[in-house]
Amino acid sequence: VMLAAGKHVACEKPLAGTLEDARAMADAAKKAAKKGVKTFVWFNYRRCPAVALAYKLVREGRLGRILHVRARYLQDWGGPQTPLSWRFQKKVAGSGAHGDLNAHIVDMARFLVGEEVSEVHGAIERTFVKERPLPGKKGETGKSDVDDVVLFLASFAGGATASFEATRLAIGHQNDNGIELNGEKGSLRFSFEDMNVLELCEGGDARTGGWKRIMCTSAGNHPYAANWWPDAHVIGYEHGFTNMAADVLRTLAGLEPEVPLPDFADAYQTQRVLEAALQSARQRRAIKLSQIK
């Protein structure tokens, strides 16, 4: 409705609760785009300075051809003691860790690699906690029917292999949104639990090789750093949302964002990967993305 009325739209991720709804939204956005209407999806982790720097390094060819991707999003707040809420009810949330967490890391992997996923296989979906305490009702429980864990393997169009894992039952991991890329010339890795740091390892002289930690807080050298505090002063979770909002406003003003913003068409590709993973888990076979329309 808003797109048809010519309004720019920013949407939470994932794009929709179902593939069909996501497709309808992407189609509506494509039609509205012909009239200059823009869409955005709130994949805020792209706006972390370290992730934006990783994007730039990959585009500069510092890693060479990407061979492997390992992505994870591990949290520990969803144990059996956690009271029932909308997040654990499929009719409201749509999915559990898959839509909540895998959506982020699939988007991040696609964003960094710069290619689409071509096939998903080896997927596993589990619901371990099927009853949860009802808030304010001592001794009573309610049904929890979303996935607690979804993990899967994938291939990118250019041949790179990938693994994805999402869970809210990993004790000791509060918000470990992490990714590692291995290329022919180097590797990089990031974890949101150390969000101001990007780790980089470039091949070459074995005497001086190895991982180095880059504090992404230098104005003029690191994305978004000039917008905040003096050099070496770190930022936090909330600053990613501000960076996102700033890039949206820059785009609406006709300026370039620091790094590309996901629109409905982009987010629909992530939704297709999520759907392929669920089909792979339930059918116990490989699913080509060409099958997911």
Residue ranges and their predicted role:
Residues 35-40, 45-144, 198, 284:
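Predominantly a Rossmann-like dinucleotide-binding segment in NAD(P)-dependent oxidoreductases
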Residues 268, 282-293:
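C-terminal lid/capping helical subdomain adjacent to the catalytic/cofactor pocket in oxidative enzymes
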Residues 1-46, 61:
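Beta-strand-loop-alpha-helix segment that lines the small-molecule cofactor/substrate pocket
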Residues 103, 165-173:
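Glycine-rich phosphate/pyrophosphate-binding beta-alpha loops
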Residues 236-240, 244, 274-283:
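Stable alpha-helical structural segments in soluble proteins, enriched in small hydrophobic residues
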Residues 158-160, 169, 184-187, 285:
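Short acidic/polar mixed-charge low-complexity motifs
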Residues 111, 133-145, 151, 155-158, ...:
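C-terminal glycine/acidic-rich active-site capping loop/insertion
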Residues 25-28, 54, 276-277:
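Aromatic/hydrophobic pocket-lining residues that form π-stacking "cages" and hydrophobic walls in ligand
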